[in-house]
């Protein structure tokens, strides 16, 4: 999977519906703190009006192929959600070799380990610092991206996930048969 070229303009993207859960207010504050960086929200939603920083583009709803292409052009994937389950867009970004920067909530923390395969942030300053490092794309950031990509292949591929589900169902069936 090719990553965005390192000489491409520094772009940060997120993907999904613009709702309270996805924390567009924080996304906007982060963008406002980094006016030299372009931010793209791929999607739409009832809180679109909160994305007021001049360096934010909201695509509206686009076809899946276009959403993937837009994400591929970005260097960084940002997920500042207030809560998550297992965020599929995060897994996809890891597969696309994006530097991932996420909020410190269950779901995100289940997948991203701070400064191992991305950044887990709690404060505006932490997000800004992580994005600045991603813009520079130092050796650590490249290592996090590679670690995240290898983890996707080893932990979240279809075969691996089917095997994990099979184990869960087998344990449940065995427990039922014992009772």
Give names to the regions the model predicted.
Residues 99-102:
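Short hydrophobic beta-strand element within catalytic cores of glycosyltransferases
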Residues 114-125, 133-139:
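Conserved acidic donor-binding segment of nucleotide-sugar-dependent glycosyltransferases
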Residues 4-22, 28-32, 39:
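Conserved donor-binding/catalytic core segment of Leloir-type glycosyltransferases
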Residues 50, 91, 105-115, 119-121:
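Short acidic/histidine- and often glycine-rich active-site loop of Leloir-type glycosyltransferases
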Residues 82:
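Aromatic "clamp/platform" in nucleotide-sugar-dependent glycosyltransferases that forms part
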Residues 49-65:
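Nucleotide-activated donor-binding/catalytic signature segment of Leloir-type glycosyltransferases, i.e.
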Residues 140-155, 164-167:
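A short, well-ordered alpha-helix in the C-terminal region of glycosyltransferases
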Residues 61-62, 69-74:
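Short alpha-helical donor nucleotide-sugar binding micro-motif in glycosyltransferases
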